[in-house]
Amino acid sequence: IGAHMDGHGWGEAANDDGSGTALVMELARVFSMPDVTTERTIRFALWNNEETGLNGAWAYVNQRKALQGIENPKGSGKYPEPKWLGVIQHDMMMWDHGMPRADGSFSAEQRPEADVNIEFQSTAKLADQAMKLAFFFRDANEKYATDYPAAVGHHMTNTDSTPFMDDVAAV
């Protein structure tokens, strides 16, 4: 579960991506509570240099991909880099994706009333798995956050899940 910490300094950084960073930190706080258990390890990551080329996420993928699922030290039962099952990137959480274009029209991929936009990349090697993950979250959102309707889009670009999208389901 990730977000990027950097932003442009002319006013948008609180949303792009201070909002995503705050959400990831809150999720980490909640999931680290003693009474919360999960069946899988959840890694929380805050990337840097997204605005200048996804450099932090690319560095992580390049440095850690080959280490997935390798026990270290051998026989310890410890896996410093768990096998990746998916990536959930939070970017611009306060953006109103339902706003119409300047001419008043809406994107075909977004509902006019959508407050949550869940995107995957349809050209990724694992696009089918990413699409399933996106619709899983959309369906969960429809069930648990009925005041915040969600839409799924298939043109995810230029965010920190991009370096992962050919290796795991990424939204």
What do the PLM-derived regions correspond to, one by one?
Residues M25, R29, M33, N62, ...:
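Short, well-ordered alpha-helices that flank and scaffold nucleotide-derived cofactor binding pockets
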Residues I1-L54:
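Alpha-helical metal-binding/catalytic segments enriched in His/Glu/Asp
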